[in-house]
Amino acid sequence: MSDQFEKLLTTFQHHLEVERNLSVHTIRAYMGDLTSLVEHLEKLGLNDISTLELAHLRSWLANQGVKGGARTTLSRRAVSVRLFTKWALKNNYISKDVGATLATPKGHRTLPAVLDVQKAALAMDSMATRAAEEESPISLRDVAILELLYATGARVGELCGLNIGDIDYNRNTIRVLGKGNKERVIPMGKPAIKAVQVWLKNGREELV
């Protein structure tokens, strides 16, 4: 690595440590990405950061993909470069932020793993046993939360937004506000209703 690039990366690392106050792990990852970029640039014959172009960055990122880099890793490397070029422009090392439009590769999305019936039942039993042993408001609350999640399939965010009045004990339903402020009415079983009632009676007042 040339002296110019080495000094540049050292200055940028100081910026990450002092001004951005990033974690050691994050800084190590960013600097590893930028070291890889600089090595690629030097192979292309680029030794002056002021001549950096978007094509150089795309070439490097594509090369990382050919080497088998995971999409999540490529995404982080794109972030590293954009952070660097933004800083370089601000400090007059380059005349335009060539990394601003560097696309972040989309990560591969997989369906979340789900519990089978036996594991779900085991989790419920374990929580109920703990609540019975501890007799604490928090344990009763946790049982109610777990029962509601299992019985209704509601999202965690939806559950966090619930009010006591959203539960209809006569119809055994619960009203949740989902994405896009769309309201849904979901049926719920007796175990969930009982867990909520026990928590309201024996635990809620101590936590409010």
Question: Which residues does each PLM region occupy?
Answer:
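Conserved catalytic core of the tyrosine transesterase superfamily
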Residues: 1-208
